[in-house]
Design a protein with these regions (language model features):
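Short amphipathic alpha-helical interface segments
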Residues: 5-34
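Short, cationic-aromatic polyanion-contact patches
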Residues: 1-9, 24, 54-63
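Alpha-helix boundary/capping detector
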Residues: 16, 39-43, 54-55
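Glycine-centered, phosphate/nucleic-acid-interacting loop/turn motifs that mediate DNA/RNA or nucleotide
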Residues: 50
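Short amphipathic alpha-helical interaction segments
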Residues: 33-47
Length: 63
């Protein structure tokens, strides 16, 4: 049985996208209050883990 482990900030982003459906990186930045450089890394990691996908260039949603 394989479990995916997420950091607190990754969980926060997943929760935001679960509630809102789709958000731009600017909206995620404002709502999460995570620093921009850290948010970019979190979004990349979540994409690599297959949890989120980018949409329309700057948007993100759950996979």
């Amino acid at each position: 049985l394989s479990q995916k482990l997420f950091t607190l900030n990754e969980t926060s982003i997943i929760s935001l996208l679960h509630r809102e459906g789709q958000l731009s990186s600017n909206e995620l930045l404002q709502r999460s209050e995570i620093p921009q450089d850290e948010l970019a890394l979190i979004l990349l990691n979540l994409e690599l883990k297959g949890m989120i996908k980018s949409t329309n260039g700057d948007g993100y949603m759950l996979s």
